[in-house]
Amino acid sequence: MADPHRRRPPLQVVREGNPGKAPVREGVRLPPSPLVEPNWLDTFPTVADLDQRETNTRCREIARREWRRVVPVLTLSAGLAAVDTQTVQDYCICVARIDQCERDLSTRGMVIQGERGWMKNGSTTIAGQYRQQLARYIGELGLSPSARGRLTPPEDNQDEDDNVFD
């Protein structure tokens, strides 16, 4: 049986109605501001080792592509502010590192030859840890259907006269 004193999520209140006119808890709203894309060369530097250099080049490209894919969407749906830059940057790094681990698993396999025989490829553990962190970022940023239901989109500053439904 459901606890009658438990708060309902704001979206559920909207869907089911609010007959008791209980206040709907809203979070702190920051004014939206443009996010500046980080210099991915700082995170994935050019190194002397050719294999690592290629890996870092690919990670830079993956992170850059993910940033450019999600920031415009998040700006509209979640109203990102400058304080959110680090969270989005970490999200993009997770995506790039998961790609790096998956490529390693595809080329070297799940089990590799070690000093003492066959052992699990370390990329399997690392990929799992990054996936757990990525799931947290997806929830924080509202990048999944269930997480989007918990977000309130930023209000547009439109005049009431400009309403297309009038």
Task: Place the predicted regions along the sequence by residue.
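An amphipathic, hydrophobic-aromatic interaction surface with interspersed Lys/Arg
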Residues: 40-111, 166
